[in-house]
């Protein structure tokens, strides 16, 4: 690790802002800046020269968190899977390119990455696809025949708790309505491969079409969702939500990381230089509204 004094960076060369179990990380074209407390360390990043990686950045890839907060980088619409090991970029898959992943929910569970829903080949989907690190391929998951059948969608909001994933809303399209917002809450159980509908959302939400980059889990029960100048806090155990308005300086960019009970975000100036700002989660959550009911109608007792 090479210590550096620089604390302001050029956003044009920034590929990802993320973290592992120990450090915040700024991943640039040819280097990784690791941040431990207030110390900055520069490590060279080895990337094999390839035209396929010209778009290796947060606009085109989702970060999926694995064991020990490891980062997997999954192409948003094709499903290619990369990771960084010993400061080298490694491709983990042998899969062919696919256009079925746009707007999908990518979730790590028991040494696999699962893709739920998404848009590809001019239509939304409700398929579940699993990436197996042993055979390095994506394979379709067979859903139990008695499972609830969810509507096709993209850009659903998700929250993982143990063997279950909650899915909140989403959007689909048809000839008559280009953006039909779905008002449902359901779960998927990894153990029996079943969806279950929990209830119908109140029709007063504005966080549809939310990119997965704007979803930050806080604990087993709660996640934050960022949309324009509003942050939503949803409690999936109590089926309540709270919100905080007037936070455009945090919500405007998808470069946000929660690390060690602190929310870090990039403050970008007019010259596209940025500094890392932070706020303690406890201080942030103190300013949220009082809890409101999430659902209008409940089908499944929690």
State the predicted function of each range.
Residues 1, 297-302:
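C-terminal single-pass membrane-anchor helix
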Residues 7-27, 32, 52-76, 81, ...:
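Conserved short beta-strand element of beta-propeller blades
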Residues 182, 222-249, 260:
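Active-site/pore-lining binding-face segments in mid-to-C-terminal subdomains
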């Amino acid at each position: 690790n090479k210590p550096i004094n620089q604390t302001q960076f050029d956003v044009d060369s920034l590929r990802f802002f993320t973290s592992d179990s120990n450090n915040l990380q700024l991943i640039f074209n040819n280097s990784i800046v690791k941040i431990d407390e207030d110390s900055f360390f520069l490590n060279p990043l080895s990337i094999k020269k390839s035209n396929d990686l010209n778009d290796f950045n947060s606009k085109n890839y989702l970060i999926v968190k694995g064991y020990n907060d490891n980062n997997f980088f999954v192409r948003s619409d094709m499903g290619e899977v990369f990771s960084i090991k010993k400061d080298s970029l490694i491709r983990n898959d042998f899969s062919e390119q696919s256009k079925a992943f746009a707007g999908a929910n990518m979730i790590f569970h028991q040494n696999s990455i699962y893709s739920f829903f998404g848009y590809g080949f001019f239509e939304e989907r409700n398929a579940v696809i699993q990436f197996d690190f042993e055979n390095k391929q994506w394979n379709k998951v067979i859903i139990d025949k008695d499972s609830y059948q969810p509507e096709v969608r993209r850009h659903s909001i998700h929250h993982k708790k143990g063997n279950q994933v909650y899915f909140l809303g989403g959007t689909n399209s048809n000839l008559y309505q280009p953006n039909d917002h779905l008002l449902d809450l359901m779960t998927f159980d990894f153990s029996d491969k079943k969806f279950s509908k929990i209830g119908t959302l109140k029709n007063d939400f504005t966080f549809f079409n939310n990119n997965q980059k704007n979803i930050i889990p806080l604990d087993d029960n709660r996640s934050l969702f960022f949309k324009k100048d509003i942050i939503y806090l949803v409690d999936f155990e109590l089926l309540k939500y709270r919100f905080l308005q007037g936070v455009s300086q945090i919500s405007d960019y998808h470069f946000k990381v929660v690390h060690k009970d602190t929310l870090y975000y990039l403050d970008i100036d007019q010259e596209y230089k940025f500094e890392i700002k932070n706020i303690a989660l406890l201080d942030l959550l103190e300013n949220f509204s009082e809890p409101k009911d999430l659902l209008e109608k409940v089908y499944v007792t929690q």
